[in-house]
Swiss-Prot record:
GO BP: photosynthesis, light reaction
Protein name per Swiss-Prot or TrEMBL: Light-harvesting protein B-800-850 beta chain
Protein's UniProt keywords contain Transmembrane helix: yes
Organism: Rhodoblastus acidophilus (Rhodopseudomonas acidophila)
Superkingdom: Bacteria
Length: 48
């Protein structure tokens, strides 16, 4: 029952694994974006 493929052609287990990678990538992107905004705030006239 667990090897039933959905619309994407992935099994439930494969989808969950892929989702973990997507979430990890989003978190990394978020951290980099926050860091970039802090630098932009510190080194530019933005909001000063």
């Amino acid at each position: 029952a667990d090897d039933v493929k959905g619309l994407t052609g992935l099994t439930a287990a494969e989808s969950e694994e892929l989702h973990k990678h997507v979430i990890d990538g989003t978190r990394v992107f978020f951290v980099i974006a926050i860091f970039a905004h802090v630098l932009a705030f510190a080194f530019s006239p933005w909001l000063h």
